């Protein structure tokens, strides 16, 4: 099979390629480009699983970045086991065709306990005293020590949170090139997250985005020069486009105010209690799964959600077939936001009763995606010395809570998850092998076919 690298530049759309991305502009002019009709939800886990299986979410089962695990009555986000994906993966199929085929997965999701030959993925150490230490997980296990000895510890806090920078993306790029030098895999999948941050914080129209575009352009230039120099075919693609928003919608507050959602009180704060709730929403950017305990009440909950400002479409039962989300993991009801809105997870009615994890970066405890984790509370006076003191306490071994995340969802200016109004905001795929991409628009399931054609 032919050596191929797939570079996933998160959030890259045709509208962002231009003066701020001189290399990508020049490279794309020599390449064939197709718009990818977004999968729903247009989020990381669902898009990537669709790309590397060639199947829709109702087949591969990845209905979002998280969902309600009905057997344990818990909402879980960002799980990593590849066994959650319920369809054959491209590397397994390619290996059946060519036993010498090898694959490196560099930070695409569902990258633990996988059948790829080489993998690297973020995996912090969670210590008993509450500390979270930057680290990564690799296969083979010794690869972790090699990469972190050469490039330093994976910069977790530059990968997600208020201080995200190009450092995490550059680390992934460096690690990818090193894995290629060491093992020369046939197929390499690379995830570059840098654009995901300020496009959500500021929105795609903010002039400050130009700096981010220049930074990712430089990383792409380095990667493409490296891989083309090693005879690899390069595919550039993205998962979704991020569009301007100005209205957060708290579906769980609506459900609570109407008697469907239950909470548990702990030390004066409130925890969402999904197992005790008649209905609740698991929100994921611009799409929400609403889980309804009693199927006889689906119609009334659907009617309630349909009337919420910012909700564009509500689908239940077989109506979900149209967007390929009829799967046991999906909610009984699917809600889609309108173009200017997105769904926040908030369920408390008084900020004083918000749980302690609401004000920190805590991707696993929150019952929904929270982009506000990328913003430090602008109302905190003397933020820098306050953070420095907390870090000092952490280094001295004291417990501390980095509670600097605001409870103001209106701060978010960009989102994704639905199909954008303009194709200029669709995700894209680019390759210099024009004969392998005859269309100008493809379905997300066809990304699998494009990659396979390059390999063959």
Which residues are covered by each model-predicted region?
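Short, structured active-site-proximal loop/turn typified by the sulfatase FGly-forming signature C/S-X-P-X-R
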Residues: 15-59, 104
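A short acidic (Asp/Glu
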Residues: 16-19, 115-117, 200-202, 245-249
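Short, solvent-exposed loop/turn segments at secondary-structure junctions
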Residues: 11-14, 41-42, 57, 108-113, ...
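Short glycine/proline-rich, acidic loop/turn segments that cap or connect secondary-structure elements
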Residues: 412-431
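Secreted, luminal/periplasmic, and some membrane-associated catalytic domains
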Residues: 19, 37, 42-43, 66-83, ...
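Beta-strand elements within well-structured catalytic alpha/beta cores of enzymes
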Residues: 2-15, 27, 51, 94, ...
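His/Asp/Glu-rich, glycine-adjacent segments
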Residues: 55-203, 215, 276-282, 286-293, ...
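Conserved alpha/beta core surface patches that mediate binding of polyanionic ligands
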Residues: 171-178, 183, 268-271, 405-413
């Amino acid at each position: 099979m032919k050596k191929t690298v797939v570079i996933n530049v998160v959030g890259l759309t045709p509208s962002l390629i231009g003066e701020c991305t001189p290399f990508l502009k020049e490279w794309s002019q020599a390449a064939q480009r197709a718009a990818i009709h977004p999968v729903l939800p247009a989020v990381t886990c669902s898009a990537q699983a669709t790309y590397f299986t060639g199947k829709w979410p109702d087949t591969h089962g990845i209905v979002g970045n998280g969902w309600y695990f009905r057997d344990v009555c818990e909402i879980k986000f960002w799980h990593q086991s590849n066994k959650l994906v319920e369809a054959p993966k491209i590397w397994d199929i390619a290996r059946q065709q060519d036993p010498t085929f090898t694959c490196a997965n560099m930070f695409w999701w569902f990258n633990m306990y996988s059948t790829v030959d080489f993998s690297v993925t973020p995996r912090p150490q969670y210590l008993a005293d509450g500390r979270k230490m930057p680290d990564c997980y690799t296969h083979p296990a010794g690869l972790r020590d090699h990469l972190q000895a050469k490039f330093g510890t994976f910069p977790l806090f530059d990968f997600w949170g208020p201080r995200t920078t190009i450092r995490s993306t550059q680390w992934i790029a460096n690690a990818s090139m090193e894995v290629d030098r060491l093992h020369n895999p046939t197929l390499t999948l690379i995830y570059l997250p840098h654009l995901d941050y300020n496009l959500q914080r500021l929105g795609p129209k903010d002039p400050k985005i130009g700096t981010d575009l220049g930074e990712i352009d430089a990383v792409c230039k380095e990667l493409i020069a490296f891989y083309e120099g090693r005879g690899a075919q390069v595919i550039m693609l993205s998962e979704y486009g991020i569009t301007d928003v100005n209205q957060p919608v708290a579906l769980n507050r609506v459900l609570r105010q109407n008697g469907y959602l239950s909470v548990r009180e702990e030390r004066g704060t409130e925890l969402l209690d999904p197992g005790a709730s008649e209905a609740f929403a698991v929100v994921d950017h611009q799409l929400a799964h609403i889980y309804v305990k009693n199927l006889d009440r689906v119609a009334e909950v659907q009617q309630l959600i349909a009337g919420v400002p910012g909700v564009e479409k509500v689908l239940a039962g077989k109506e979900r077939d149209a967007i390929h989300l009829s799967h046991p993991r999906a909610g009984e009801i699917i809600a889609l936001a309108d173009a200017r809105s997105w769904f926040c997870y908030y369920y408390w009615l008084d900020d004083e009763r918000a749980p302690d994890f609401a004000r920190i970066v805590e991707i696993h405890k929150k019952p929904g995606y929270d982009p506000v984790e990328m913003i430090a509370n602008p109302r905190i006076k003397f933020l820098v010395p306050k953070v420095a003191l907390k870090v000092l306490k952490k280094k001295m071994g004291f417990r501390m809570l980095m509670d600097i995340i605001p409870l103001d969802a209106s701060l978010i200016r960009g989102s994704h998850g639905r199909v954008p109004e303009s194709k200029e905001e669709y995700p894209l795929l680019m390759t210099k092998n024009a004969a392998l991409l005859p269309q100008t628009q493809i379905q997300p399931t066809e990304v699998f076919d494009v990659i396979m054609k390059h390999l063959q």
